[in-house]
């Protein structure tokens, strides 16, 4: 029998997104993340329209999708605190620490996490790891500092690769760092952010997910 891995993974992403949407309560200020899994969440939100008071988005891409479905997206400065933020991840470890930023929205995502009372991360089982770092670590950097930051990362043992033809919503660029040992995500997140010219990096350990909703390959839901 022919097995389509991508279609199956999409089904799992949709399953996790649908489960997370059940956490939406009345009069909620909802933060919406970015990425393929969140795309399924956005589609599901039409069933919760009456409960959502305000929507805050972490990217221009998600904002376009939300507005296309008739949602009024509000700037975080006007929304204030986010009651619930839902987003995906590129990797998630046993401590609910994450690597994010494959979609280049890591800075706004990290701001939304910081402003949220609760952060639910939605993933399929392929994103669950014991140790972070197999997925290249995205770092958003000020363009003029790109080469300088790359040299500092090499000193830390990483192999930075410039993500060509990618400009973030903030007008910056992305370095994807390969082969970086992430034994202590909290320490490395702090260390990388102290390099001059770094806007932020894709490790979410200072404020990890409060809850992880994971769809397994046998189409079950596991809550971490």
Swiss-Prot record:
Residues annotated as binding substrate: 34-37, 87-90, 100-103, 127
Catalytic activity, reaction form: aldehydo-D-ribose 5-phosphate = D-ribulose 5-phosphate
Gene Ontology BP terms: D-ribose metabolic process; pentose-phosphate shunt, non-oxidative branch
InterPro entries referenced in this protein's UniProt entry, alphabetically: NagB/RpiA_transferase-like, Ribose5P_isomerase_typA_subgr, Ribose5P_isomerase_type_A
Listed GO MF terms: ribose-5-phosphate isomerase activity
Keywords in alphabetical order: Isomerase
Pathway, per record: Carbohydrate degradation; pentose phosphate pathway; D-ribose 5-phosphate from D-ribulose 5-phosphate (non-oxidative stage): step 1/1
Pfam family, one: Rib_5-P_isom_A
Keyword Isomerase in record: yes
Documented EC number(s): 5.3.1.6
Function: Catalyzes the reversible conversion of ribose-5-phosphate to ribulose 5-phosphate.
Quaternary state and interactors: Homodimer and homotetramer.
Protein name per its UniProtKB record: Ribose-5-phosphate isomerase A
Species: Francisella tularensis subsp. tularensis (strain SCHU S4 / Schu 4)
Gene that this sequence comes from: rpiA
